[in-house]
């Protein structure tokens, strides 16, 4: 819709192939395929790698995060609605993938930033981190007037759904076990 002339290749399924890949092609794949096919993907020059729903790489020691780090690219960016879910190491992992070295090695980041902020509530460490990452984070909200004006308002509907007989039995067994 926005760039109909740009070729797009779906690299997914059993018949996937990168044969005849042109430099201007956008390649779409899944994290699972990227993890399994990292060597094949790393054999090609990439101008840009974009990780959508990048919470999939927030654990820096996961197989997926490690695999994506082996695929060289001139630039990388990560899209996520939750850059930090549980700990600051989530943020370190995303930024170390997009901008290697920005926050230093993981052990130093933990020692100098994560522990002081998370455990000690150190405002100086928090401000230092905020200053470092501010240029790399873009926070947008659906309420911002320029963000997707054609999106309808959010609608929430509660529906009562009865449990099946099996679900009732499992629920009662769990309650009895816990109580």
Predicted features along the sequence, with ranges:
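Conserved helix/coil segment N-terminal to the catalytic DExD/H
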Residues: 14-48, 59-63
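A short helix-turn-beta junction within AAA+ P-loop NTPase domains corresponding to the substrate/partner-engaging
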Residues: 92-104
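SF2 helicase catalytic motif II
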Residues: 42-79
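ATP/adenylate-binding site constellation spanning eukaryotic-like Ser/Thr protein kinases
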Residues: 5, 73, 175
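Conserved AAA+/SF3 P-loop NTPase catalytic/coupling segment centered on the Walker-B
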Residues: 88
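Inter-lobe coupling linker of SF2 helicases/translocases
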Residues: 28-34, 39-43, 102-179
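Conserved helix-turn-beta segment of the N-terminal RecA-like "Helicase ATP-binding" lobe
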Residues: 1-12, 102
């Amino acid at each position: 819709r926005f760039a109909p002339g740009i070729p797009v290749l779906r690299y997914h399924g059993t018949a996937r192939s990168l044969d005849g890949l042109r430099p201007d092609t956008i390649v779409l794949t899944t994290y699972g395929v990227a993890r399994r096919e990292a060597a094949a993907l790393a054999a090609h020059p990439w101008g840009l790698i974009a990780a959508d729903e990048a919470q999939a790489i927030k654990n820096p020691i996961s197989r997926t995060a490690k695999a994506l780090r082996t695929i060289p690219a001139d630039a990388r960016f990560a899209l996520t609605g939750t850059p930090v879910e549980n700990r600051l190491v989530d943020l370190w992992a995303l930024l170390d993938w997009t901008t290697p070295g920005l926050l230093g090695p993981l052990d130093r980041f933990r020692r100098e930033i994560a522990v002081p902020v998370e455990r000690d509530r150190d405002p100086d460490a928090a401000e230092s981190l905020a200053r470092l990452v501010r240029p790399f984070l873009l926070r947008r909200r659906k309420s911002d007037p320029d963000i997707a004006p054609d999106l309808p308002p959010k609608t929430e509907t509660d529906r009562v759904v009865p449990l099946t007989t099996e679900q009732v039995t499992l629920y009662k067994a769990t309650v009895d076990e816990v109580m």
